Amino acid sequence: MATPAAVNPPEMASDIPGSVTLPVAPMAATGQVRMAGAMPARGGKRRSGMDFDDEDGEGPSKFSRENHSEIERRRRNKMTQYITELSDMVPTCSALARKPDKLTILRMAVSHMKSMRGTGNKSTDGAYKPSFLTEQELKHLILEAADGFLFVVAAETGRVIYVSDSVTPVLNQPQSEWFGSTLYEQVHPDDVEKLREQLCTSENSMTGRILDLKTGTVKKEGQQSSMRMCMGSRRSFICRMRCGNAPLDHLPLNRITTMRKRFRNGLGPVKEGEAQYAVVHCTGYIKAWPPAGMSIPEEDADVGQGSKYCLVAIGRLQVTSSPVCMDMSGMSVPTEFLSRHNSDGIITFVDPRCISVIGYQPQDLLGKDILEFCHPEDQSHLRESFQQVVKLKGQVLSVMYRFRTKNREWLLIRTSSFTFQNPYSDEIEYVICTNTNVKQLQQQQAELEVHQRDGLSSYDLSQVPVPNLPTGVHEAGKPVEKADAIFSQERDPRFAEMFAGISASEKKMMSSASASGSQQIYSQGSPFPAGHSGKAFSSSVVHVPGVNDIQSSSSTGQNISQISRQLNQGQVAWTGSRPPFPGQPSKTQSSAFGIGSSHPYPADPSSYSPLSSPAASSPSGNAYPSLANRTPGFAESGQSGGQFQGRPSEVWSQWQSQHHGQQSGEQHSHQQPGQTEVFQDMLPMPGDPTQGTGNYNIEDFADLGMFPPFSE
């Protein structure tokens, strides 16, 4: 049976595209056709371009599969690129140590957008502050720690929405000058365009390239420009803001430090009538305005405060690169200035203080060799020092030379220089010099020393009072005048109760006993060592409140007379040494109280026989041989020039023992250290609770202070 191809071989051949040469045998032609149809499946890629005409039957399906794979690959690349940009925009993602996966990036981005829109979890809104602090207290603490002020500005118009009251101590401007104005009015005119770029959120806000600080590569702005529209994108810029001229008296005292810092961080002295500016570093975020759940009043929307975004930032004073020596008073004169040179000595930078030191403007010195201003005799010395400091690499080298000022005078300058090296290449970049006017520095130091010396000499000596003593006669015949007015002082208010407790009858009673103590122990012709004038009376004076200064005398009557006189004159406190008042009948220096003193005072044996032994007048002997077992801490005269070390309650017992020795010459029996002594024949003390009784305990005086210390 014949096949269709065998019946009509030419028709079969006509269905095959292209020209095919058929052999004579029909079956051979049919086999040749089938082989031709099966060949593209095995070696289609190695066929010549002419043979691709045979593949048009399966071509559309193959090309569609290849196009689908390419489209998927491009879509994945774009998604990876967008997620990478999203990761850079979200602060929480960029802060991670390792790169997060795509799901983490999307989750963090959603959380960040919710927090920016104010739709986050309300239960955690108050977790950022302690429970015991209010919002106002927290705001003041943050602003005080930041040493700046908080302000909110509309992004589109620049109108000030809010400013904290701390703007007054920082910029010396009240809040009223900021409210109702724009931030463009508060900054320097040259910084307006820079501020407008920071407030703008459009795609075309900035052009150029951006340096990626993480990788160190420079990227085009088009890759990062989408960050400008992010509501939580960070802003950090430096600008010059206008300062006010409010008087300092209206500011609190704790803001004086901030005011000094603002003057030091200023841009130098300004001309009369010109506005003064301070360098302010502003850091903050662009946020949505108004926040979620808050509506803007109609009057605010009419004036243009209905912006979609706002800048919330904190402004802090920025330390300027040019040091300014002007203080608040403006009286300090600089004595030094900084300069920067290359290795050849050419000046590349000089700070403005050179105007006050050498008279030149900074532009007059830039680009010139420092040797041009040096004295010809010192040029070789200065050149060698520059060569040496380059070799030292970082070490400081000082040199003194004569510098020619602008008024053609030679000024002695001390220059301390060192080199700055590039940390990567270890090459010397430049030389930094500190130039000091030696003469002016010495003058300022001398003035400071004189001021300190004057401050010590102007010490008020009225704080060291001396009682107004009556006029007496020195043993040499020279009169002793009364104390000057500088030694006068009112009664100490600490002992007002004690003075108030003294009645008129007590004063009269004590003054009546002054007649019995009129005799003198020493004759007027007895020698009195002159070296005693510089001796401190702290070792021979007993200080008791109410009975100010009692020096030992020959009898109890003289002591009581002295007490009465001092009570009428006022309260006295000793702080050290004072000029003595020798030769006074009522106050005589006794050898019995010369503890630690190296000046023996001769006494009349007839009138002073009980204490005229060498043991009483010797500086190293015991002043009270009969009381050696009672008061070991009080009568130890081996402590030269020392203060009393004994208990205050034992002073009266020794005073009474001296009284008995002078009147009757009887020897006291040795008493035990803890035994109580009774004073039968002693007048009661003013304000004594035991007044009217014959017996009382000497421990009642234990709380009376002896020689209270006073700092000079």
UniProtKB/Swiss-Prot annotation:
The keyword Ligase does not apply. Residues 63-116 form the bHLH domain. Residues 63-73 have a biased composition (Basic and acidic residues). It is found in: Nucleus. The modification Omega-N-methylarginine is found at R42. GO terms for molecular function: aryl hydrocarbon receptor binding; DNA-binding transcription activator activity, RNA polymerase II-specific; DNA-binding transcription factor activity; DNA-binding transcription factor activity, RNA polymerase II-specific; protein heterodimerization activity; protein-containing complex binding; RNA polymerase II cis-regulatory region sequence-specific DNA binding; sequence-specific double-stranded DNA binding. Pfam families: HLH, PAS, PAS_11. Residues 398-441 form the PAC domain. Keywords: DNA-binding, Methylation, Nucleus, Repeat, Transcription, Transcription regulation. Its main location: nucleus. Coiled coil: none annotated. It comes from the Eukaryota. Disulfide bonds: none annotated. The keyword Mitochondrion does not apply. CDD domains: bHLH-PAS_ARNT (cd18947), PAS (cd00130). Residues 597-626, 653-675 have a biased composition (Low complexity). InterPro entries: bHLH_dom, Circadian_TF, HLH_DNA-bd_sf, Nuc_translocat, PAC, PAS, PAS-like_dom_sf, PAS_fold. Residues 1-20, 35-74, 573-712 are annotated as: Disordered. Transcription factor that plays a role in the development of the hypothalamo-pituitary axis, postnatal brain growth, and visual and renal function. Specifically recognizes the xenobiotic response element (XRE). Efficient DNA binding requires dimerization with another bHLH protein. Heterodimer with NPAS4 or SIM1. Heterodimer with the aryl hydrocarbon receptor (AHR) or the SIM1 protein. Interacts with TACC3. PANTHER family: CIRCADIAN PROTEIN CLOCK/ARNT/BMAL/PAS (PTHR23042). This is Aryl hydrocarbon receptor nuclear translocator 2. It comes from Rattus norvegicus (Rat). The gene is Arnt2.
